[in-house]
A protein has these predicted regions:
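Membrane-helix interface segments
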Residues: 36-37, 71-73, 119, 150-155, ...
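Membrane-interface helix/loop boundary segments of multi-pass membrane proteins
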Residues: 133-159, 186-193
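N-terminal, membrane-interfacial amphipathic/helix-forming hydrophobic leader that caps
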Residues: 1-76, 80, 84, 206-246
Length: 246
């Protein structure tokens, strides 16, 4: 194992330990105090502290990488387009799995308590801080380290995406999260920056919260096939844009 890969493994294992430690402490304090607010603030502040430490120690590069200054705002816009398009594609796939294969598990996912996302702490934790801290760990440390250790790009992207998906436990979630990880990993490899991934992750998590409060059940399959085609086309265009412009 070369020195760069060894360093990557150590940093990622440390990040993983801190990530789960904050989660356990947050849930424990929330249970002891019988307060969801305490749990949410503990998680938000804990993950924020991890992010500050990793950025402060320069373990992760927070720059636009190979994205030229004049292309920053177009890149932000394309990141949002990719996020929204993939979210609807993912929703369609999970809904099909719900109907044909994993109805009980998908129903349990859809019944997650939306109150966990409410309030300043809930929004900060779910929509902003979690995307940042996860992009630090998976793309900023793990994928970046694999690429620096001369691992083949597609192998590095796939390995990172698999680990990222396994972090999200449920089999139904793994399917959509694996694709999500591959897209964000490819964008990191293409741009040399975790910023597009952070933007996509923030939009994705924000839409997940919105979807928790509204009914998007598939009543007319024909309409959803049209939406799927539009979103796949938008997703392909976003990826093509990053390939062409960066």
């Amino acid at each position: 194992m070369n020195e760069e890969l060894m360093k990557t493994v150590k940093l990622f294992l440390l990040w993983s330990f801190l990530y789960f430690a904050v989660g356990i402490i947050g849930v424990f304090l929330g249970h002891i105090c019988k307060s969801e607010e305490i749990m949410k603030w503990t998680l938000a502040l804990g993950y924020l502290l991890i992010s500050i430490v990793y950025f402060g120690k320069h373990y992760v590069d927070l720059s636009f990488g190979r994205i030229e200054r004049r292309m920053v705002w177009p890149a932000v816009g394309m990141s949002v387009l990719v996020a929204v398009a993939y979210m609807f594609v993912s929703f369609f796939v999970i809904s099909m799995l719900d109907i044909y294969l994993f109805m009980e598990e998908s129903e349990s996912l859809n019944k997650s308590d939306p109150n966990l996302f409410l309030g300043i702490a809930g929004i900060l934790h779910s929509c902003i801080i979690i995307p940042i801290v996860e992009e630090i760990g998976f793309r900023g440390i793990f994928l970046a380290g694999l690429l620096k250790s001369r691992c083949r790009p597609w192998l590095a992207i796939l390995i990172t995406a698999i680990v990222f998906a396994l972090f999200h436990m449920s089999f139904v979630k793994i399917i959509s999260t694996l694709g999500f990880g591959i897209i964000i990993g490819w964008l990191y490899w293409r741009t040399g920056s975790i910023i597009p991934g952070i933007i996509i992750h923030i939009v994705n998590n924000s839409l997940c919260i919105v979807f928790a409060f509204i009914d998007l059940s598939i009543e007319s399959l024909a309409i959803w096939w049209v939406i799927l085609v539009v979103c796949l086309s938008s997703l392909a265009y976003g990826v093509w844009w990053f390939w062409k412009e960066v």
